[in-house]
UniProtKB/Swiss-Prot annotation:
Topological type in the membrane: Multi-pass membrane protein
Parts of the chain on the Cytoplasmic side: 500-523, 587-595, 709-731, 800-824, 903-904, 984-1093
Keywords: Anion exchange, Antiport, Cell membrane, Coiled coil, Cytoplasmic vesicle, Disulfide bond, Glycoprotein, Ion transport, Membrane, Sodium, Sodium transport, Synapse, Transmembrane, Transmembrane helix, Transport, Zinc
Lineage: Eukaryota, Metazoa, Chordata, Craniata, Vertebrata
Gene3D superfamilies: Helical hairpin bin, Mannitol-specific EII, Chain A
Function in brief: Mediates electroneutral sodium- and carbonate-dependent chloride-HCO3(-) exchange with a Na(+):HCO3(-) stoichiometry of 2:1. Plays a major role in pH regulation in neurons. Mediates sodium reabsorption in the renal cortical collecting ducts.
Residue spans of biased composition, Basic residues class: 59-77
Protein name per UniProt: Electroneutral sodium bicarbonate exchanger 1
């Protein structure tokens, strides 16, 4: 961004073009930039010629000729006479159109754009020492400067440039030497070729040439060398040590590890895979930590500026090497150099040269100019790139901005694709149709029309990735995810088993729940389509089990046998759904339904975590109004009940207890509760004596676990410690929290409630085994009647499984190995049937656990430029974490001695963390925060730019109403119909098409699939529009090939349609400015001076 507030230098630079007469720009710069494309060139643009190899340039170094010399332009002019009218229009193309034409050329091997690292070096002279090139700034994406003290790099920041320095840079390229596709192997050869071109115009005599050559070949001193040259490093920061430890090992060509200490000088295999044996690299001078941030295959762009006392006018050269060459000692990091920009001038204008160098380096980091620099064939192409850059910059008012302020790099850099798109006749840019949100319309959800067709395609899609699902798990991140989720999964499984045991009088309890979860999870992780999904128990299943058990008890039926029949019918119906590709209906589940369902599950997790903590007050009561002076008078003793109930009397009778012989006052709390005694005294609560400290200590454990987990998870973005340490702490955040809290709880010694794990592997009740007879003592007709509740169960399983699968498989997660909706449902169905036969609980996809699993396996770019936010790359897709979670869960019976130390409040804190963290990224909660927020304070959400705020609020209110209804049903005795209500959300969303336009819904939600008839109508309408557009093009007489039309929107032809006075051509308007006229006049004076000398 040019900062208009910068002060203009005392004088403007004068340049002389060395390879021909000085070009004096008197306001007609557009004529210099006229690109006379011949008809044959336009017709051949974007055309692939097979089997024809064209030379990229001359092989001789001595006869290397700059692009844009007189005879070339004459040739162009001769060709132009054949198509005068078309080329006259082309002469007035905007820089944007010219750049689009340049970028449309076919790429060859030598002109494929690479990532660029740009370094700015300036000549530095110290008293009593020889001059040397000193690194003063560098760019990988953002600018970093060597601070004034010379001891450290600045923080990366967005470069702000003065408009004057950009004009001077443009003048440099017009009047300086431009050498494209130079073949050279060393800085000496490059210097000679540049000076040869300068001598052609008699600008340099022999003595000046020698001095300039000496200046170009001076030693380069880089900032990282200063630390390494210190002979006595007394203090080394922990961060620097961490950098060394976290650097990747460098490998020599034999695969052996190379360290800077062991091999001071060796041939380094550069990151683009080229090994330059003639350019040895001293590893001791390489900043290995910074090298890690350089992308693989990157090339260097070196900007050399400085003052030389013998010169009376600047020497400017822009060089593109072909191929790129590793120039030893020139660049801070050992990567091949592709571009060089050299500016040497008289003494007294060092700051001016510095700003021009910054402008050159900054413009090389621009995505569009970067590509133009690689594909340019002549000087005019580079000028078009600069003009296009100037056409896009933003100017800051001088009175409202301080140029010394450093702008922080943005979190998200906007895409530059629109700058590459061709224009349309009205002068606007053709916008790419964006996909605001990811839908579910991929090939995985298309009906095949064949029996089990979708399942077969799922297997074919997932089979090639199967072994990679195990290889990709070789990462510490997977270990952290596994340890965290094992602890997170254990507690709900055991809690669910305990609740089920209470509801079924011990027929299915904790040990059955552990065994069922382990067996189902292992099978699912091994063979499911989407192994990132974590299976768990759900609330509606528990409600169903309670209702079924009560029904069986009322009608004297065998609960486990009837349950087995229902489970087998449910499994069969699910397999029927797989066979008929019913999972394709998932495409009707849009973001509206997903977010309502996911939000409800997250809120339930948060609510139940807090509810369980509050419930501890009943087990561990406290005396809220204690009088400290009466502490010695408080007591609580066990006594004989005054009015024992029938249950108590029967217990005493069964155990032969004679109440008169029992010393009730001497019994412990557990003994008193076991013998059905009563507690009496001023320190007694409803269920026993007041318990000191336990409830408050549990609260401390609960909230500390949540806060510490959240803090450690965000530690990755903190400013402390090296990157690898921060990443490891972030990955292991929850496990470290649990471990820390267990140690603290053990050391404090307060008897907090602990995780209770069954210690013996056998059924809870002795009157049942591991295999259940589906008929058993029940009448035969119960087998057929079981299909009725099985239908409801099937809807429950299908909705829970597929909504969770849809959330996991969203396009935002960038999954690369495909989905497997049909295969997932098949595995759930098979294991549901197995669990029914064995009398084990049913397990289906658990939404919050699955979201947490995915979030713990997020991948971010490791090689990010300084100041650039790491990019989200996707999810580490593998099967091992899920497999290990459930394998270890099955072994938990043998780990009771360890697991008994885990306090339950810590696990409740983990539930709270999982619920809160899963809410992040749910758009519904972002929209909910907009209520009551003034418009000026609202975040810049993309949908707020395209949808009126009242429509956003209406959409949110409808979603909130549905969420409240779901909550009410979930908490009521009618919770068994909860899946039906989730299904009803799909119909609610369909009705919303009447209240919102298609465009509004595309930003707020996913578009629902339309009917077949509507699709056919839209296809016919689109075909008709294309046909009319073709007719209009034919009437317009557009003779360009189709590909050229798409790329250029017909260069030159657009101009004939351009009648909007607001449209300008920056190349035409720039020469009219006073600044440019001053530069041109100075250039003219320089020419006259050179002629008369």
């Amino acid at each position: 961004m040019p900062a208009a507030g910068s002060n203009e230098p005392d004088g403007v630079l004068s340049y002389q073009r060395p390879d021909e007469e000085a070009v004096v720009d008197q306001g007609g710069t557009s004529t210099i930039l006229n690109i006379h494309y011949e008809k044959e060139e336009l017709e051949g643009h974007r055309t692939l010629y097979v089997g024809v190899r064209m030379p990229l340039g001359r092989q001789s170094h001595r006869h290397h000729r700059t692009h844009g010399q007189k005879h070339r332009r004459r040739g162009r002019g001769k060709g132009a006479s054949q198509g005068e009218e078309g080329l006259e229009a082309l002469a007035h193309d905007t820089p944007s159109q010219r750049v689009q034409f340049i970028l449309g050329t076919e790429e060859d091997e030598e002109h494929v754009p690479h990532e660029l690292f740009t370094e700015l070096d300036e000549i530095c002279m110290k008293e009593g020492e020889d001059a040397e090139w000193k690194e003063t700034a560098r760019w990988l994406k953002f600018e970093e400067d060597v601070e004034d003290g010379g001891e450290r790099w600045s923080k990366p920041y967005v470069a702000t440039l003065s408009l004057h320095s950009l004009f001077e840079l443009r003048s440099c390229l017009i009047n300086g030497t431009v050498l494209l596709d130079m073949h050279a192997n060393s800085i000496e050869e490059i210097s000679d070729l540049i000076l040869d071109q300068q001598e052609l115009s008699s600008d340099l005599n022999d003595s000046m040439r020698v001095k300039v050559r000496e200046a170009l070949l001076k030693k380069h001193h880089h900032q990282n060398e200063k630390k390494r040259n210190n002979l006595i490093p007394i203090v080394r920061s922990f961060a620097e040590v961490g950098k060394k430890q976290s650097d990747p090992h460098l490998m020599d060509k034999h695969g052996q590890t190379v360290s800077p200490q062991s091999v001071p000088t060796t041939n380094l295999e550069v990151k683009n895979g080229v090994n330059c044996e003639h350019s040895p690299v001293d590893l001791s001078k390489v900043d290995l930590h910074f090298m890690k941030k350089i992308p693989t295959g990157a090339e260097a762009s070196n900007v050399l500026v400085g003052e030389v006392d013998i010169l009376d006018r600047p020497i400017v050269a822009f060089v593109r090497l072909s191929p790129a060459v590793l120039l030893s000692g020139l660049t801070e990091v050992p990567i091949p150099t592709r571009f060089l920009f050299i500016l040497l001038g008289p003494v007294g204008k060092g700051q001016q040269y510095h700003e021009i160098g910054r402008s050159m380096a900054t413009i090389m980091t621009d995505e569009i100019f970067h590509d133009v620099a690689y594909k340019a064939k002549e000087r005019d192409d580079l000028l078009a790139g600069i003009d296009e850059f100037l056409d896009q910059v933003t100017v800051l008012p001088p009175g409202e901005w301080d140029p010394s302020i450093r702008i922080e790099p943005p979190k998200n850099v906007p895409s530059q694709e629109k700058r590459k798109m061709p224009g349309v006749p009205n002068g606007n840019v053709c916008h790419i149709e964006q996909e605001p949100h990811g839908g579910h319309s991929g090939p995985e959800l298309q009906r095949t029309g064949r029996l089990f067709g979708g399942l077969v395609l799922d297997i074919k899609r997932k089979a090639p990735w199967y072994w990679s699902d195990y290889r990709d798990a070789l990462s510490l991140q997977c270990l952290a995810s596994f340890l965290f989720l094992y602890c997170a999964c254990m507690s709900p499984v055991i809690t669910f088993g305990g609740l089920l045991g209470e509801a079924t009088e011990g027929r299915i309890s904790a040990i059955e729940s552990l065994f069922g979860a382990s067996m189902t999870g292992i099978a699912y992780s091994l063979f499911a389509g989407q192994a990132l999904t974590i299976l768990g128990s759900t609330g509606p299943v528990l409600v169903f089990e309670k209702i079924l058990f009560k029904f069986c008890k009322d009608y004297a039926l065998s609960y486990l046998s009837l349950r087995a029949c229902i489970g087998l019918w449910t499994a069969f119906l699910c397999i029927v759904l797989v066979a008929t590709d019913a999972s394709s209906l998932v495409c009707y589940i849009t973001r509206f339904t997903e977010e309502a369902f996911a939000s409800l599950i997250c809120i339930i997790f948060i609510y139940e975590a807090i509810e369980k903590l509050i419930h501890l007050a009943e087990t561990y009561p406290i005396h809220m109004h204690s009088q400290l002076d009466h502490l010695s008078l408080y007591y609580c003793r066990c006594t004989l009940p005054e009015n024992p109930n029938n249950h108590t009397l029967q217990y005493w009778k069964d155990h032969n207890i004679v109440t008169a012989e029992v010393h009730w006052a001497n019994l412990t709390v557990s003994e008193c509760q076991e013998m059905h005694g009563e507690f009496m005294g001023s320190a007694c609560g409803h269920h026993g004596p007041y318990t000191p400290d336990v409830l408050f200590w549990s609260c401390i454990l609960f909230f500390t676990t949540f806060i510490l987990s959240s803090t450690l998870k965000t530690f990755k973005t903190s400013r402390y410690f090296p990157t690898r340490v921060r990443s490891m702490v972030s990955d292991f955040a929850v496990f470290l929290t649990i471990f820390t809290m267990v140690i603290i709880d053990f050391l404090i010694g307060v008897p907090s409630p602990k995780l209770q794990v069954p210690s013996v592997f056998k059924p809870t009740r002795d009157d049942r085994g591991w295999i259940i007879n589906p008929i058993g003592p029940n009448p035969w007709w119960t087998v057929i009647a079981a299909i009725i509740p099985a239908l409801l169960c099937t809807i429950l399983i299908f909705m829970d499984q597929q909504i969770t699968a849809v959330i996991i498989n969203r396009k935002e997660h960038k999954l690369k190995k495909g989905c497997g909706y049909h295969l997932d449902l098949l595995m759930v169905a098979i294991m549901l049937g197995v669990c029914s036969i064995m009398g084990l609980p049913w397990f289906v996809a658990a939404t919050v656990l699955s979201i947490t699993h995915v979030n713990s396996l997020k991948l971010e770019s490791e090689c990010s430029a300084p100041g650039e936010q790491p990019k989200f790359l996707g999810i580490r897709e593998q099967r091992v974490t899920g497999l290990m979670i459930f394998v270890l869960m099955g072994c938990s019976v043998f780990m009771t001695a360890i697991l008994k130390f885990i306090p339950m409040p810590v696990l409740y804190g983990v539930f709270l963390y999982m619920g809160v963290s899963s809410l992040q990224g749910i758009q519904f909660f972002d929209r909910l925060k907009l209520f009551g927020m003034p418009a000026k304070h609202q975040p810049d959400f993309i949908y707020l730019r395209h949808v009126p705020l009242r429509k956003v609020h209406l959409f949110t209110l409808i979603q909130l109403t549905c969420l409240v209804l779901l909550w009410v049903i979930k908490a009521s005795p009618a919770a068994i119909v909860f899946p039906m209500m989730v299904l009803a959300l799909v119909f609610v969303r369909k009705v919303m098409d009447l209240c919102f336009s298609k465009r509004e819904l595309s930003w707020l939600d996913d578009l629902m699939p339309e009917s077949k008839k509507k699709k056919l109508d839209d296809a016919k309408k689109k075909a008709k529009e294309e046909e009319e557009a073709e007719k209009m093009l034919e009437i317009g007489g557009d003779k360009f090939p189709l590909e050229s039309r798409k790329l250029l929107s017909s260069p030159g032809k657009n101009i004939s349609c351009r009648c909007d006075p607001s449209e300008i051509n920056i190349s035409d308007e720039m020469p009219k400015t006073t600044v440019w006229k001053a530069l041109s006049m100075n250039s003219g004076n320089a020419k006259e001076k050179s002629l008369f000398n």
